[in-house]
């Protein structure tokens, strides 16, 4: 990590320029804090002795004369709108123009690489007396003139060369002005860049002082500005163009009352006395930082005193392709499905209705509206992917730039390299998927480069980073730390805001921070004004972002956005932690040096803190309760932060109360201890770092370390000090030894304990540790089940695990595994197999519908419960219903629940389980769901369970307890309506099939007797059991019994079940005037259907007629089988649709042919020119761009220039060959030289090889061709293509050729033709997938 001030040995030169006379008047050289003899030698100028020259050469090097000279670097300026920064990196060949002999002044104010141009303005002020608002700064980079702001006119850049001032011929008040600026003043926009540019490698700048123009003409100007029109001419035509720091009011004040400027506009004209004082203090502090930087870096980089010195907790990586890429983000969004792994996608694009945001989410997503209200600047798609329960966000812009961001725990200790590696692994599969979309995603060709590609630039930003200083301070020491930052605040290096918390120091670091978005101020102003609220910001803000210097409202917002990076310093027991927020990697390296030089100065040098203020790491003592607990959690949060893994876990401070927590030491600390103290330590483990840790128990009342088992969600053993030492052979001795060896204590370890170790049965209502038992609540044991068991047997509740990674309520899962005597992961594997079924959607009363297939559901079960890679998200409760169904399918086991959430115990049983309980064959498990967790009930004997955990968990018809369960279930189902079992008992009739809906409920029965066609008999939505009656997940059949046959069965049913009598209340008639059924009476009336008949049955003659405009079966059909039965005339409609869009399909084939024909010639010319250019010589480079401009447009020249600047000449040609340019698409102009007939013949010859001719077009599925590309590409299924050729009726081809020729020869049709490259027929029509929910918002 280098930290060097180049301006000390290569000083900044500031030359004052008078535009009125076009002459340079004075040069100021900022020497900074150089040795006294160097300063003296510099100031002698022409009177320097050989000794002086030797001193200067020793300090500045052999080129000292050039560094202290008055050379002007640069020639004529270029049009910044066209050739801004057009030259490659300067190799040393400069156009040096020697200025006339002018006065040179030497300043002792220091310039630093981290100075922004805003800082430079202030330093110019103290050195020259020219206040910031009078400074027009310009300089040269690579022979191109640069300024510190951007002036836009109607969206295009304006050339800003103050040296052209005398070329303006129109005058107002004796000053030359550009009148075009006033005529278009509403289209002007100034973007202030001073705060977003560092001086860095710029060593010579020029300042045009407004006073050189204004002072001689003040009287004339005063008269002119009385007229509003002349004022506008002067302000917009001169002031705003070259001195935009001045608002109209400030300019008027400058002319009329210049001495009032400091009072009225302190930001434009700060107090010179205060500014000098602040800059001298800043110089002192920064010089100290530079002086100590290398020593501190060497001391702390790679320091092993703490568990790592760096932890990135959030970051964004920007990938910038060097090649020009155009992405159709709308199509990427459409073709990319939402899944449980990628549950959310958002796209912003310009649709036929205007700016549009479309979001879609998988039904398992918990934040469906995330990002849909985001402000977008360009067409963009956002994808969110979850890996191992961690969210990664990918943002792709339509120019191929993309951003990857995520968050991490501090304990993961990610550094910059691992962050890049982690995000790369996340992004690669998505990039591959998008690239496989081909021209549908990339209409101009190309693909997204992977982060590992050499043709990209990678930058890390928006980081939050924690770093650690490996010393501790006392409370007084930390107070001293805070007080020492006050100097930095007075120097303007930091800014302290708001109230400070105890043990935390929070401030904003301002100096050298420049990586902001200059447009953020606009967005914040727009948001803050809001609809329906009055905008309280001067309208000038929209035109000039320098408004923060003359408008207090804008200044407050500017400070909020650009006020610096947030830094927090935490006073901890074991070290000092520093958090930095929203920084770049470059800023981290820079801030780290400042912060660690400051901290190291607390313990070294003449200003070090007194020894009694500094705690020694190896001399830890038993602290106060809070500090001791904090120390443990700081050094091993994975062990001591129990709620990190289970939000319901009991915290460590309750499990091990003061003064029993031990003291923890690292290996490095132990090595520095005296041998006697080292012998007192117990070696254990640091779970966060994966290295040994050492513990002591310094409190005299609790001198012995013990390890608590069964408390940590991950089964880690928790250190805690005890009064007595565990005796050999005892249970505690066994547990401690197991923990010290294995670091965990699990169920198997319990089984290995001495079988004689006694464990009492817990009372009901407490949390039950794993493999412990508890009594049932007395109202269940003593009343409900009192006569169902005999001594010595007892009913009990058995403790099982309640949590696992990512799942805070896993008790049911572990209960089922215990009941079935299976390892938990084995259970998950088996039920995952059962979930992979075509009827997966019925599971959990339709909860399976959250997934697109059984395979997806099965994979999600495995990832969640076996691999433990997923959080359950919205599936958090639905999984339990799905698991219960799968266990019933796999093991024919059903569960009943006693739920005790509010102190009142409720019996809960699902309808399907009731059906099973009421049947002869049953296997039932009883589960208690309490506030403390979910546990299985068992029948056992206490001694037997304590010895070998033997117990009965499954109950059948033979167990007396089932009589109680049967009785309670029977009572719950007697609610005044029939169900499947009632219907099965009608004599002479047989139920042949149960019809099941997508929520896994039976909605109707098919019944036969001696008829050929089944009777359709609806029932209330009922659960069902798997018995000898077949089930069918299908629609109501069309071939069913007549009314007479149906009514005969209903009369018999009414006879047997008078309480359920079926009484018709209305006749059902379809649109063909056929009678098809009737509606029964009651709130839950059912629809009875029979075979259609033209004759109204006599039984129903007196009933009202209800017309069915659409048969409910047709609606169900459309939902279940949307593509199987199209509308009667769908083929004709699809064919008409195809013919209406066939010209678009032909156009895209035409352009695809032209792309290949026309770009090759231009590319060959560029490559030849490239080979002839020496990119190390500016003259050769200039000639390259000049010749290039003869046949390539300006946008392509900028693209080529960018490639050369970022890759270097050696690699640039390779990148150029991959890139797509505008000249690839200037296709139509050469064809306009043809006559109409010639062009028709040419087009026919050109396109015939691309056409598959047909006499006529048969059925076409229009739904598959909303997105279309050339038939040459096979990334999409395109029914208009065959054999990679476009299908066209032979009798239509010539007509289309004629239309195309006419359109090409019509210059008004050019833009219309090129728009077909979008390849979308209806941009608001999207693929509808079963598990996706799509919403559309227009953004106006």
From Swiss-Prot:
GO terms for cellular component: virion component. Its main location: virion. The keyword Transcription applies. The keyword Nucleus does not apply. It is found in: Virion. Keywords: Transcription, Transcription regulation, Virion. Belongs to the asfivirus G1340L family. Putative initation factor. This is Early transcription factor large subunit homolog. It comes from African swine fever virus (isolate Pig/Kenya/KEN-50/1950).
């Amino acid at each position: 990590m280098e930290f060097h001030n180049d301006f000390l040995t290569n000083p900044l030169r500031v030359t004052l320029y008078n535009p009125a006379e076009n002459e340079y008047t004075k040069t100021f050289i900022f020497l900074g804090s150089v040795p006294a003899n160097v300063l003296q030698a510099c100031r002698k100028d022409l009177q320097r002795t050989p000794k002086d020259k030797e001193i200067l050469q020793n300090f500045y090097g052999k080129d000292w004369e050039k560094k202290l000279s008055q050379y002007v670097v640069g020639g004529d300026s270029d049009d910044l709108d066209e050739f801004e920064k057009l030259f490659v990196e300067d190799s040393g060949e400069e156009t040096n123009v020697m200025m006339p002999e002018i006065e040179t002044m030497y300043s002792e104010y220091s310039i630093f690489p981290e100075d922004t141009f805003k800082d430079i303005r202030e330093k110019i002020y103290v050195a020259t007396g020219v206040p910031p608002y009078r400074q027009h700064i310009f300089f040269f980079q690579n022979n191109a003139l640069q300024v510190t702001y951007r002036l836009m006119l109607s969206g295009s850049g304006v050339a800003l060369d103050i040296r052209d001032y005398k070329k303006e011929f129109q005058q107002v008040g004796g000053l030359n002005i550009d009148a075009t600026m006033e005529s278009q003043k509403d289209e002007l926009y100034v973007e202030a860049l001073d705060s977003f540019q560092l001086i860095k490698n710029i060593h010579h700048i020029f300042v045009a002082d407004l006073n050189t123009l204004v002072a001689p003409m003040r009287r004339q100007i005063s008269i002119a500005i009385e007229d509003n029109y002349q004022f506008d001419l002067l302000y917009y035509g001169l002031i705003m163009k070259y001195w935009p720091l001045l608002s109209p009011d400030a300019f008027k004040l400058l002319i009329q009352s210049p001495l009032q400027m400091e009072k009225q506009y302190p930001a434009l004209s700060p107090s010179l006395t205060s500014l000098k004082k602040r800059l001298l203090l800043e110089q002192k502090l920064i010089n100290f930082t530079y002086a100590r930087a290398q020593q501190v870096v060497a001391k702390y980089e790679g320091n092993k005193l703490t568990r790592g010195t760096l932890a990135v907790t959030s970051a964004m990586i920007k990938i910038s392709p060097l090649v020009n890429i155009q992405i159709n983000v709308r199509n990427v969004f459409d073709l990319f499905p939402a899944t449980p792994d990628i549950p959310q996608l958002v796209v912003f694009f310009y649709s036929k209705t205007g700016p549009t945001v479309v979001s879609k989410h998988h039904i398992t997503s918990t934040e469906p509206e995330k990002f849909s209200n985001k402000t977008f600047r360009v067409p963009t798609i956002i994808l969110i992917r979850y890996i191992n329960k961690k969210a990664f966000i990918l943002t792709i812009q339509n120019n191929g730039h993309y951003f990857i961001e995520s968050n991490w725990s501090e304990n993961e200790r990610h550094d910059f390299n691992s962050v890049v590696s982690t995000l790369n692994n996340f992004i690669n599969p998505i990039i591959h998927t998008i690239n496989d979309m081909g021209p549908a995603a990339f209409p101009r060709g190309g693909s997204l480069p992977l982060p590992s590609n050499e043709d990209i630039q990678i930058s890390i930003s928006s980081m939050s980073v924690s770093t650690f200083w490996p010393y501790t301070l006392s409370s007084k020491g930390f107070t001293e730390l805070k007080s020492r930052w006050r100097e930095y605040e007075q120097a303007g290096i930091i800014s302290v805001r708001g109230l400070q918390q105890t043990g935390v120091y929070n401030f904003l670091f301002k100096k050298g921070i420049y990586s902001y978005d200059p447009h953020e101020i606009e967005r914040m102003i727009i948001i803050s004004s809001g609809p329906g609220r009055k905008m309280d910001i001067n309208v000038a803000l929209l035109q000039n972002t320098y408004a923060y210097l003359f408008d207090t409202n804008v200044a407050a917002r500017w400070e909020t956005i650009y006020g610096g990076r947030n830094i927090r310093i935490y006073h901890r027991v074991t070290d000092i932690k520093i958090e930095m927020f929203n920084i770049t990697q470059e800023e981290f390296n820079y801030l780290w040096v400042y912060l660690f030089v400051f901290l190291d100065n607390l313990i070294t040098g003449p200003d070090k803190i007194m020894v009694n203020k500094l705690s020694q790491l190896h001399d830890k003592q038993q602290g106060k309760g809070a500090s001791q607990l904090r120390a443990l959690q700081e050094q091993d949060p994975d062990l001591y932060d129990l709620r990190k893994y289970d939000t319901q876990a009991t915290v460590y401070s309750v499990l091990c109360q003061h003064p029993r927590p031990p003291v923890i030491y690292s290996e490095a600390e132990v090595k520095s201890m005296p041998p006697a103290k080292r012998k007192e330590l117990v070696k254990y483990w640091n779970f966060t770092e994966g290295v040994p840790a050492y513990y002591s128990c310094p409190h005299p009342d609790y001198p012995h370390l013990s390890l608590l088992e069964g408390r940590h969600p991950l089964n880690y053993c928790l250190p805690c000090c005890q009064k007595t030492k565990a005796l050999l052979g005892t249970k505690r001795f066994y547990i401690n030894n197991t923990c010290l060896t294995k670091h965990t204590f699990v169920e198997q370890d319990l089984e290995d304990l001495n079988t004689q170790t006694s464990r009492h049965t817990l009372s009901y209502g407490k949390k039950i540790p794993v493999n412990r038992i508890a009594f049932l609540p007395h109202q269940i044991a003593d009343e409900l089940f009192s006569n169902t068991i005999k001594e010595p047997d007892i009913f009990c509740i058995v403790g099982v695990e309640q949590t696992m990674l990512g799942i805070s309520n896993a008790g049911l899962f572990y209960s089922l595994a215990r009941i079935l005597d299976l390892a938990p992961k084995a259970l998950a594997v088996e039920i995952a197999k059962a979930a992979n079924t075509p009827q997966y959607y019925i599971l959990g009363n339709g909860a399976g519908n959250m997934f697109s297939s059984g395979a997806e559901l099965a994979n999600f079960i495995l990832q969640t419960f076996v691999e433990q890679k997923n959080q359950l998200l919205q599936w958090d409760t639905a999984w339990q219903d799905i698991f219960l169904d799968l266990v019933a399918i796999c093991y024919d086991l059903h569960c009943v629940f006693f739920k005790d959430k509010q102190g009142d115990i409720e019996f809960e049983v699902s309808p399907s389980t009731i059906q099973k309980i009421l049947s002869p064959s049953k296997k039932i498990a009883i589960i208690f769901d309490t506030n403390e967790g979910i546990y299985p009930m068992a029948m056992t004997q206490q001694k037997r369970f304590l010895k070998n955990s033997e117990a009965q968990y499954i109950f059948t018809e033979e167990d007396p307890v089932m009589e109680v369960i049967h009785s309670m279930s029977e009572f719950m189902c007697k609610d005044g309506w029939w169900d499947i079992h009632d219907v099965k008992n009608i004599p002479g009739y047989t139920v042949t099939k149960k019809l099941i809906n997508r929520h896994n409920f039976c909605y109707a029965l098919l019944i036969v007797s001696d008829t050929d066609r089944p009777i359709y008999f609806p029932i209330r939505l009922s659960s069902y059991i798997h018995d000898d009656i077949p089930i069918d997940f299908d629609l109501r059949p069309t071939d069913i019994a007549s009314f007479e046959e149906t009514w005969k069965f209903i009369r018999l049913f009414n006879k047997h079940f008078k309480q359920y009598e079926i009484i018709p209340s209305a006749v059902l008639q379809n649109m063909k005037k056929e009678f098809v059924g009737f509606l029964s009476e009651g709130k839950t009336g059912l629809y009875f259907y029979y075979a259609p008949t033209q004759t109204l049955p006599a039984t129903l003659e007196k009933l009202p007629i209800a017309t069915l405009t659409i048969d409910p079966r047709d609606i169900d059909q459309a939902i279940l089988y949307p593509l199987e039965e199209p509308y009667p005339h769908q083929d004709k409609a699809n064919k008409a649709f195809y013919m209406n869009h066939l010209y678009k399909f032909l156009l895209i084939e035409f352009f695809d042919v032209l792309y290949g024909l026309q770009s090759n010639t231009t590319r060959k010319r560029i490559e030849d020119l490239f080979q002839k250019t020496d990119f190390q010589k500016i003259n050769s480079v200039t000639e390259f761009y000049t010749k290039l401009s003869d046949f390539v447009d300006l946008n392509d020249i900028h693209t080529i220039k960018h490639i050369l600047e970022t890759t270097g000449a050696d690699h640039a040609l390779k990148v150029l060959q991959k890139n797509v340019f505008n000249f690839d698409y200037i296709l139509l102009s050469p064809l306009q030289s043809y006559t109409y007939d010639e062009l028709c013949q040419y087009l026919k010859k050109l396109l015939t090889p691309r056409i598959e001719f047909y006499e006529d077009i048969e059925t076409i599925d229009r739904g598959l061709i909303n997105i279309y590309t050339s038939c040459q590409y096979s990334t999409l299924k395109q029914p208009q293509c065959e054999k990679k050729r476009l299908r066209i009726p032979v009798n239509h081809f010539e007509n289309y050729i004629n239309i195309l020729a006419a359109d090409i020869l019509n210059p008004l049709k050019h833009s219309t033709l090129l728009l077909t490259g979008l390849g979308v027929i209806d941009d608001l029509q999207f693929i509808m997938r079963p598990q996706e929910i799509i919403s559309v918002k227009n953004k106006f």
